[in-house]
Amino acid sequence: MAVAALALLALLPQALGQHNSSYVDYNVEANPDLFPQCLDTISLSFPDCQSGPLSKNLVCDSTASPYDRAAALVSLFTLEELIANTGNTSPGVPRLGLPPYQVWSEALHGLGRANFTDNGALHAGRPSFPSPILSAAAFNRTLINQIASIISTQGRAFNNAGRFGLDVYSPNINTFRHPVWGRGQETPGEDAYTLTAAYAYEYITGIQGGVNPEHLKLAATAKHFAGYDIENWDNHSRLGNDVNITQQDLAEYYTPQFLVAARDAHVHSFMCSYNAVNGVPSCSNTFFLQTLLRDTFSFVDHGYVSGDCGAVYGVFNPHGYAANEPSAAADAILAGTDIDCGTSYQYHFNESITTGAVARDDIERGFIRLYANLVELGYFDGNSSSSNPYRSLGWPDVQKTDAWNISYEAAVEGIVLLKNDGTLPLASPSEGKNKSIALIGPWANATTQLQGNYYGDAPYLISPVDAFTAAGYTVHYAPGTEISTNSTANFSAALSAARAADTIVFLGGIDNTIEAEAQDRSSIAWPGNQLELISQLAAQKSDDQPLVVYQMGGGQVDSSSLKFNAKVNALLWGGYPGQSGGLALRDILTGARAPAGRLTTTQYPAAYAESFSALDMNLRPNETTQNPGQTYMWYTGEPVYAFGHGLFYTTFNASSAQAAKTKYTFNITDLTSAAHPDTTTVGQRTLFNFTASITNSGQRDSDYTALVYANTSTAGPSPYPNKWLVGFDRLAAVAKEGGTAELNVPVAVDRLARVDEAGNTVLFPGRYEVALNNEREVVVEVELVGEQVVLLKWPEEVQGVAGDE
C-alpha cells in the first residue's frame, strides 16, 4: 500500500487535470462512478509510538485529550499531505511514520469490505447475521445489541490482523417509508419514533462498546442523514433526488432516530446522504450538519461526518448546487462534511484554497475530528492489551461470542407467522407423518440469496433443501419458476414434485435481483408468475396435503390472494435469514421453534404503490396528490397485513396486571419541571409503566412479543395519526398450559408528545389511550392537563458556514 500511497500523493499536482467535461447523468444513473483508489481495501498497520518518528509527538501521549493529540499530529502535515488524506482512502504520511488508513468499512449485519484473503484461523469463517429488517422483527433489544457486539469483536480481531478498519459505515437507520424502496431490507422498518430509534441505540452501543466506554471498540456511523429512502424509482436517481420535506415531517419522522443516535447512543460518526432536501444537498447542508447535529442533537464534540461515497461530487453533479467541483468541495467542507468518501477533496482542494474559498483551518477541522476518533479507538496506543483491551482480540475471541447460534436465533426470532389454519407446526417424520416434503420455488434451495445485501462473508450457507434433508425428510425439490420470469416451462416438474410429497412448501417472493442498493421495485405485487404456480399447486393438492408458503425478501409483497385462498394453509414472512436461514425456516415449520416475530412494515395492497409518487415524502394523507397516508401511523386504507401483525402457535391472553392502574392524570407543568437526574432530558423520564399479565393457555411454550401504542383524537393539531408505537418488549419462553409472565414497558414522557407544523416536539393537553398490540388487549387511559409545553424546539433553518470547534 505504500506504493499506492505515494501514487496518490503524486496525483495532487495533476488535480485540475481530473476534470471531466462529459458528465454522467446522475439524475437517472443511480450508481456513482468512483475512482479506483476510493474502493481500495488496504492492509492496515499501526503507527509506532514507541520508537517511530511520531514517538515524541503529543499524539503518542496517552495522558493528553484525544482532540489535542489529533491536533498535534495534523499540525505536522504539509498542506499537500493534509489534502491527500481527506478522502476515505488515506495514504498516510510516510515521512511521519503514519500508515495508510481506510475509513470505509461495513458492518451492517456482518463484516463487509474486510480483507478476506486466506489467513488461517481468520479465514475459517466470519459470522453473518440475518438482514436488519428480519432481526428487528424479533422486537428484542438485547438481541440487536448482541449482534452488534459480536460484529465489533470480529471487526477488532480483523483490525488487529490488519484486515479491517476501526470505523464502520453502519447502521442504516433511515426509515422504510415507501414499500418499493430497494434498501429497506437494511433498516429496522417503517417506525422512526420508537423502533428505529431503539434499534439505533442498541446497534450503535453494541458496535462502540457501550454508551461512554472507557475504550471505544469501533466507531459506528449513523446513515444516511437525512431524508434518504429512494434509489431509482421511475428513473429518479438517489444521486440527484431533491425531495421536499416539511419541518413537521423532518422532526417527527425523518430525524428522531438520528437524534437518539447522537444524544443517547453517542455515535461517533454520521454519513450525509446523496439526496438534497428542500433544494440543498445533504452534504452541503449546514442546517443538517451543524444546526441539527451539533447544536441541537448534541453530536459528540469530535464526532466526524463522512459524505456518502461520491456525494460531495454530487453537490456539483447532478445537483448543480455548486458551479464546479472545487466549489462543491468547498461547500461540503464548510457545511461540516469532514471526510469525503470519494476523491473530490483530494483532487480539488488545491484550487479551492487558491481561490480563497477554503482555508487550511477548514480542512484541518474535519481531519482532526477523524483522528481524534482514531485516538479514542487506540490506534496510537501500541498493541499492548494493558493500554487497550481490544488490541489483543483474535479469532478465539470471536469464537467465544457464540456468534453462530446468535445468527440462528436472530432468524428464528424474526420470522413472522402471517396466516395459519392450524396446519402448522408440521408433524415430524419421526411421528409417522410428513415424511416427504416438496420444496418448490426460487428460494427453495437458496444459499447466497439468504444473505440480502451488505452481508458479511459467511462461513457456510444452509439452504432449505439442506436443512430438511438433514432432518430426515425425503425432499422433492423443484424450483418451478424464478423470481421474475413468466416462463411456465418448469411448472410441470414442480407440480409432479408436489404430487409425490406429503407436504408442499413454496419458498419465493423477492430477492436482491429486484430490491437492492440503486434498485427500487416498480411494483409491490409478487413478481413474475410465482402466484400462478402457487395457485396451480393449491388447485391440485388433496385436502389433507398441507400447502405452506414462505414469503421471502426484505420488502413486502401483496399476498392478499394467499391470505384469502383457503387451500393455502399457512403463510410466513422470512426476510433474509442469513447463514443458518434454512435451519431457521425449517425449525419454525416443524415446531422445533415457535414463531413470535411481528411485521415492522405494513403490507399494502399492490394498488398502493401505483396510487401516488414514491417521491412524495409527506406522511399525512392528501386528496389532492392522491396520497393515502404513509406508514401505519397515517395510512387511511386497509392493509393486507398491518404493521405489528404476527401470530403464534399457542394462545396468549393478556389482562391488566394485578393492582395496575388503568387511568392516569398528569399535570404537564409538574411533569416538565421535575428533576430528571437519570435522563438527559425531562422528556426521557418514565411517565408510567404499562403493565399486563400474559398467560399462555395453549399447548406450546412460546416467546411473546408486545407492542404498545398510543393514540389520541383530542391532543394537539389535527389530523391525528391512527396510532404510534411508544414501546415494545419480548418475553422469553412463556410456559404452555397456564404459564404466566409479567409485561412491564416503560412509557416515557416524550412518547406522548406530538410534533407541530413548525417542527417543535410538544406535550399537549388532552386524552390519550395506550394499548397493547393491534388487538388492543389492554388499554390504559391517560389525561394530560394544564398548558402545552415544548419539549424540543425545532431550530430555524438557515444555511451558512459551519462554526469552528
From Swiss-Prot:
<dbReference type="InterPro" id="IPR026891">
    <property type="entry name" value="Fn3-like"/>
</dbReference>
<feature type="glycosylation site" description="N-linked (GlcNAc...) asparagine">
    <location>
        <position position="622"/>
    </location>
</feature>
<feature type="glycosylation site" description="N-linked (GlcNAc...) asparagine">
    <location>
        <position position="711"/>
    </location>
</feature>
<feature type="glycosylation site" description="N-linked (GlcNAc...) asparagine">
    <location>
        <position position="405"/>
    </location>
</feature>
<keyword id="KW-0964">Secreted</keyword>
<feature type="glycosylation site" description="N-linked (GlcNAc...) asparagine">
    <location>
        <position position="653"/>
    </location>
</feature>
<comment type="pathway">
    <text>Glycan degradation; xylan degradation.</text>
</comment>
<dbReference type="InterPro" id="IPR001764">
    <property type="entry name" value="Glyco_hydro_3_N"/>
</dbReference>
<dbReference type="GO" id="GO:0031222">
    <property type="term" value="P:arabinan catabolic process"/>
</dbReference>
<feature type="glycosylation site" description="N-linked (GlcNAc...) asparagine">
    <location>
        <position position="445"/>
    </location>
</feature>
<feature type="glycosylation site" description="N-linked (GlcNAc...) asparagine">
    <location>
        <position position="140"/>
    </location>
</feature>
<feature type="glycosylation site" description="N-linked (GlcNAc...) asparagine">
    <location>
        <position position="350"/>
    </location>
</feature>
<feature type="active site">
    <location>
        <position position="308"/>
    </location>
</feature>
<feature type="glycosylation site" description="N-linked (GlcNAc...) asparagine">
    <location>
        <position position="235"/>
    </location>
</feature>
<keyword id="KW-0325">Glycoprotein</keyword>
<dbReference type="InterPro" id="IPR002772">
    <property type="entry name" value="Glyco_hydro_3_C"/>
</dbReference>
<feature type="glycosylation site" description="N-linked (GlcNAc...) asparagine">
    <location>
        <position position="244"/>
    </location>
</feature>
<feature type="glycosylation site" description="N-linked (GlcNAc...) asparagine">
    <location>
        <position position="115"/>
    </location>
</feature>
<keyword id="KW-0732">Signal</keyword>
<dbReference type="InterPro" id="IPR036962">
    <property type="entry name" value="Glyco_hydro_3_N_sf"/>
</dbReference>
<dbReference type="GO" id="GO:0005576">
    <property type="term" value="C:extracellular region"/>
</dbReference>
<keyword id="KW-0326">Glycosidase</keyword>
<feature type="glycosylation site" description="N-linked (GlcNAc...) asparagine">
    <location>
        <position position="490"/>
    </location>
</feature>
<keyword id="KW-0858">Xylan degradation</keyword>
<feature type="glycosylation site" description="N-linked (GlcNAc...) asparagine">
    <location>
        <position position="20"/>
    </location>
</feature>
<keyword id="KW-0378">Hydrolase</keyword>
<feature type="glycosylation site" description="N-linked (GlcNAc...) asparagine">
    <location>
        <position position="383"/>
    </location>
</feature>
<protein>
    <recommendedName>
        <fullName>Probable exo-1,4-beta-xylosidase xlnD</fullName>
        <ecNumber>3.2.1.37</ecNumber>
    </recommendedName>
</protein>
<dbReference type="Pfam" id="PF00933">
    <property type="entry name" value="Glyco_hydro_3"/>
</dbReference>
<dbReference type="InterPro" id="IPR017853">
    <property type="entry name" value="Glycoside_hydrolase_SF"/>
</dbReference>
<dbReference type="InterPro" id="IPR036881">
    <property type="entry name" value="Glyco_hydro_3_C_sf"/>
</dbReference>
<dbReference type="GO" id="GO:0045493">
    <property type="term" value="P:xylan catabolic process"/>
</dbReference>
<feature type="glycosylation site" description="N-linked (GlcNAc...) asparagine">
    <location>
        <position position="486"/>
    </location>
</feature>
<keyword id="KW-0119">Carbohydrate metabolism</keyword>
<feature type="glycosylation site" description="N-linked (GlcNAc...) asparagine">
    <location>
        <position position="689"/>
    </location>
</feature>
<feature type="glycosylation site" description="N-linked (GlcNAc...) asparagine">
    <location>
        <position position="434"/>
    </location>
</feature>
<feature type="glycosylation site" description="N-linked (GlcNAc...) asparagine">
    <location>
        <position position="667"/>
    </location>
</feature>
<feature type="signal peptide">
    <location>
        <begin position="1"/>
        <end position="17"/>
    </location>
</feature>
<dbReference type="GO" id="GO:0009044">
    <property type="term" value="F:xylan 1,4-beta-xylosidase activity"/>
</dbReference>
<dbReference type="Pfam" id="PF01915">
    <property type="entry name" value="Glyco_hydro_3_C"/>
</dbReference>
<comment type="similarity">
    <text>Belongs to the glycosyl hydrolase 3 family.</text>
</comment>
<dbReference type="InterPro" id="IPR044993">
    <property type="entry name" value="BXL"/>
</dbReference>
